[in-house]
Amino acid sequence: MSFILTFWMIFLMDSIIVLISFSIFLSVWICALIIATVLTVTKINNIYCTWDFISSKFIDTYWFVLGMMFILCLLLRLCLLLYFSCINFVSFDLCKVIGFQWYWVYFLFGETTIFSNLILESDYLIGDLRILQCNHVLTLLSLVIYKLWVSAVDVIHSFTISSLGIKVDCIPGRCNEIILFATNNATLYGQCSELCGVLHGFMPIVINFI
């Protein structure tokens, strides 16, 4: 429930920011059009005008306030996005990911332990993706919010799944946390994207959402 409310709040905030930005953009062009029209009519009709556009305090104040309002709107959106990105949503379950040289270990539901290694060349089947197939796949439920704790034991790794927009470093002695959520059933592939040794390119990640 909190995830849905947060999603709609961010969506509404983005819509408001876009509307405000468009309104300010439109107002600036309307003001520029009015000023250009006034100057053109004044020049054509030879009307003597004493307006001082160079040192007008009113115009300086107007543009300063307009710019500050625009910047404050952008800062408000940024602060809200940073705040909601750090909130611990109500998650279904916890999944721990530990990086080793050169394989992954997943801990699910507090008891299940999955060792995920690259399969041997002789075990490939027709249609398998080379260097992206594991002997054990991490199976999760779609439309369910998961909290992932990511760490490493020996060297720095990087848990990366481009399809989900996930890239988090696995640092020994440090636990990084990310939220994982998928809307469709799919099998997603990833790899370690941090140079972690000789077999760095042989640490595939496979997550199957059902």
UniProtKB/Swiss-Prot annotation:
Residue spans, topological domain Mitochondrial matrix: 37-63
Molecular function GO terms recorded: copper ion binding; cytochrome-c oxidase activity
Binding locations of Mg(2+): 194
Binding, Cu cation A1: 157, 192, 196, 203
EC number from the UniProt entry: 7.1.1.9
Reactions the enzyme catalyzes: 4 Fe(II)-[cytochrome c] + O2 + 8 H(+)(in) = 4 Fe(III)-[cytochrome c] + 2 H2O + 4 H(+)(out)
Assembly, per entry: Component of the cytochrome c oxidase (complex IV, CIV), a multisubunit enzyme composed of a catalytic core of 3 subunits and several supernumerary subunits. The complex exists as a monomer or a dimer and forms supercomplexes (SCs) in the inner mitochondrial membrane with ubiquinol-cytochrome c oxidoreductase (cytochrome b-c1 complex, complex III, CIII).
InterPro entries in the record: CcO_II (IPR045187), CcO_II-like_C (IPR002429), Copper_CuA (IPR001505), Cupredoxin (IPR008972), Cyt_c_oxidase_su2_TM_sf (IPR036257)
UniProt keyword annotations, A-Z: Copper, Electron transport, Magnesium, Membrane, Metal-binding, Mitochondrion, Mitochondrion inner membrane, Respiratory chain, Translocase, Transmembrane, Transmembrane helix, Transport
Organism of provenance: Trypanosoma brucei brucei
Record-given protein name: Cytochrome c oxidase subunit 2
Family that this chain belongs to: Belongs to the cytochrome c oxidase subunit 2 family.
Membrane-crossing segments per the record: 16-36, 64-84
Membrane-topology descriptor: Multi-pass membrane protein
Protein task: Component of the cytochrome c oxidase, the last enzyme in the mitochondrial electron transport chain which drives oxidative phosphorylation. The respiratory chain contains 3 multisubunit complexes succinate dehydrogenase (complex II, CII), ubiquinol-cytochrome c oxidoreductase (cytochrome b-c1 complex, complex III, CIII) and cytochrome c oxidase (complex IV, CIV), that cooperate to transfer electrons derived from NADH and succinate to molecular oxygen, creating an electrochemical gradient over the inner membrane that drives transmembrane transport and the ATP synthase.
Location relative to the cell: Mitochondrion inner membrane
GO biological process: ATP synthesis coupled electron transport
GO CC field: mitochondrial inner membrane
Listed cofactors: Cu cation
